[in-house]
Structures are given as C-alpha cells and as structure tokens.
Amino acid sequence: MVGYWHWHSLHNAIETYWKGLLGHDFEPNPTYNEAKTIGADFNRLNDDLLGFRKKNDVAFFVSNEAMTGFDDFSFGWFSSEKYNDILRPFYDALYKMNVGVDFVDPSTIERLDNYKMIIVPILYAASDEILEALNTYVENGGHIVYTFKSGFSDENVKVRHTKQPGLIRKVTGNYYNQIVKPENVTIKGDQYKLDAKDEEVKYFMELLTTDSDTEVLAYYDHPVWGNYAAITENKYGKGLATYIGFMPGDKLIGEIFKDQLKKANLWGKDQELTFPIIIKTGVNKKGKTIRYFLNYSAKKQSLDYKYGKGSELLKGATIQSGQLLTLEPWGVQIIEEN
C-alpha cells in the first residue's frame, strides 16, 4: 500500500501543516504530479506487482507487556531510555543490511518455527509459558538472540526468584546477580575488529558468568569487571542461543548481527549491499521473483546485479546477471526475474 497524508492540506486546527498531496490552494504541484506518475506506473504494472508475497527468515519477538514493564522502570531513576529506544537500533541494523524481518508477539507464539532466527530485545516481563516456548524453539534448531533484561520478571512484572535471566538460563548458559551502570567501559576478547570508541557499552550492563560449555564472544574491558562476560553463545538441543548483556552502539550491533547471520546461514547476496541501497524481494502472483532496488540517498549509487536474468519493469530494459546497475538519486528499479 502507498498512503498519503492527506489528499489535501487542512485549513485549520492542529493538522494545518501536515501537508497533503494538494496544498491549501487545491492546485496541482510537484508533489501531486509525482504521485500521478507513481499511480500511472502501478496501473501499467498491475499484473507484475499485484499479489506480492514476501517470506522472511528472521523475526523480532516483541511484547506489549515487556514494553510496559520496562518503560515503568527503564534503567533506574532519571533514565530516559524506553523499550523502543532499545528495539529500534537492533531493527535499524538489520534494515541497513537488507535483512527482511517480521514481528511476532505472544499471541503468535506458535509461529516461531517459521523462522530461522529470532531476536528478542528486553523481554522484561513474560510468563513461564512464553519463555518455555522460546526455549523449545532453540531446542528444535532455532537460532535466538537475546538482549539484556530478558526473562527478568513474570507477566505480572514480579521479579523471578531464580538466577537471572530466569527460565531462559538453561538455553543461554549464563547467569548474573550484579548489574552496573557503565562508565568508560568497552569490550575485549572479541572478533569484531572495531575501534574502541565503536565498542562502547551503553546504558546498562549485566556481569555475566557462564556455564562450563558456554562460549564467550566478548568480555568487558574494565579494570574491575574484566573477568565478566559481555556476550555469550550457547548450543542447546539442535539450536543456538546468543545473549548480549549490555546495550551496544550502532556499529557494534551491526558486527554482532553479521556474525550471527553467518552462523545461521542467512548471509547472502542481499547482505553484500548496504544502506543507502535497500533491496526488497518477493514473489508476484505469477510466481516470479520481484526485486525492488531503492536508493535512499541524494547521490547516484551503483551495484553489481548478481541475480538471475530479468526485466526492469519501469523502463522495460533487459537485465543480465553481472550487469552494473546505476540507481539515480532517490531512484528505484524493479526487476522481475525471467
């Protein structure tokens, strides 16, 4: 769906300057004229674009209960960070890496097995049943990535009496009973090869101790807390559970996900391209693969087209595998594979 706010600009009240396709004078303008070209293209290409279906192998597990519980406490008094402030950087990292994701929640818990990887950010409040379902997902071969403050309290926001991170501890292979507000802390012993400034530890950190067979992907770089794990990875059943005990910066999140995607066999041609080139792939009603190549920048962008031979639908050009594609500033090409 392509939606516009609004059809025309309102003339009074709070939405006066939430401009529409038409201005306050109801006259055609560049925005309106551009929308007309989009409508004409859609009308011309209906048979190729309608019925577009997309299958994602990665999902975020989100929860209104966890959001409400975390937002009430955050990281303590005077902390301004909310649930979505933690979720969004993790989503943004995958978006920029051209990894399509779905969002699932406790009401769709039975769909977990549809995904090869599930990211679970700050699942602060959750019932035993939900945590056990996530454990079963890993046991059956799923790859899960938890962040800090997951499994901490039950659905009533009552903190669990067990070692943290609660019931998920048996799949994460770690535990903690000390938490710290980080100051001048980075990580060490990792393979992410970033500058120290990009390996910062933000907002909050859990001092993780691991079970004997749990792998440590990073430790905290700090004179007192250097023996504690920061990122851990544990095999459980047929699957793998990764646990991030702190809030990373944007570049570090990207490197963590790059490593995790490769381990889950989810690193492919799309991931060789990064923002501002964004790729959206699906199948149309004719059963043919459609790829949208979008340039979200004010500069021309070029890429090697490494997919199957096809047709660029907007201009009708034939596209060969290995051909160089050039995207105009803010431009798009839509390629249907033969």
Question: Where does each model-flagged region fall?
Answer:
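Carbohydrate-binding surfaces of carbohydrate-active enzymes
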Residues: 1-338
